[in-house]
Amino acid sequence: MTAQVDAVILAGGMARRMGGNDKGLVELENRPMIEHAIERIQPQVKEILINANRNQNRYSEFGFKVISDQDTGYLGPLAGMITAMSNTDAEYLLVIPCDCPLLPTDLVARMLAKLTAEDAELAVASDGKREQPVVMLLKPSLRASMKAFLDAGERKIDFWYAKHHYVVAEFSDQPNAFVNVNTPEQKQQLGEAIANEKNY
């Protein structure tokens, strides 16, 4: 039986380096950034959740359940993950950021294969050079551990998952898969990369 996988798209941050603009709604190639992520991930999962702490009505227009952090202090990606784990009954939860428009179309299959082959609790993606902490496949049963970590004042995702049996799913064959947008300059570069991808 195929494992049931839901996804959460993290769009709950402050986006300070983008001038405070809501990153998921910033347009890239004439479409909101999050729309690119949805297009890539929707065929790979059962349900999609969108974690947003502002502009919730706008995000709801994409047709998926919008969830906001249970703690409203903008505590980072971990807070969004904890909220998502409370809103899924799937066997696994895929976590992705809203600003990765070139995600692999085989992301779930490869991460799940790696995780199950090694009987791990979670899988973290890598571009072949470094791990991508906000691209993760994990068991929602890890929620209590993550909440305790956050409640202790910790924020760094990689510190948390290092405490668990995790595996790294490598995507060195797709080196641009996890390129994301933190500044207007990166947005322009990524727009050019997407345009080039369409031309091949």
From Swiss-Prot:
One of its GO terms (cellular component) is cytoplasm. Signal peptide: none annotated. CDD domains: MobA. Mg(2+) binds at residue 99. InterPro entries: MobA-like_NTP_Trfase (IPR025877), Molybde_CF_guanTrfase (IPR013482), Nucleotide-diphossugar_trans (IPR029044). It catalyses: Mo-molybdopterin + GTP + H(+) = Mo-molybdopterin guanine dinucleotide + diphosphate. Its cofactor is Mg(2+). Gene3D superfamilies: Spore Coat Polysaccharide Biosynthesis Protein SpsA, Chain A. It is an enzyme of class 2 (transferase). Transmembrane segments: none annotated. Keywords: Cytoplasm, GTP-binding, Magnesium, Metal-binding, Molybdenum cofactor biosynthesis, Nucleotide-binding, Transferase. Its EC number is 2.7.7.77. The keyword Cell inner membrane does not apply. GO terms for molecular function: GTP binding; metal ion binding; molybdenum cofactor guanylyltransferase activity. It is found in: Cytoplasm. The N-terminal domain determines nucleotide recognition and specific binding, while the C-terminal domain determines the specific binding to the target protein. Belongs to the MobA family. This is Molybdenum cofactor guanylyltransferase. It comes from Shewanella halifaxensis (strain HAW-EB4). The gene is mobA.
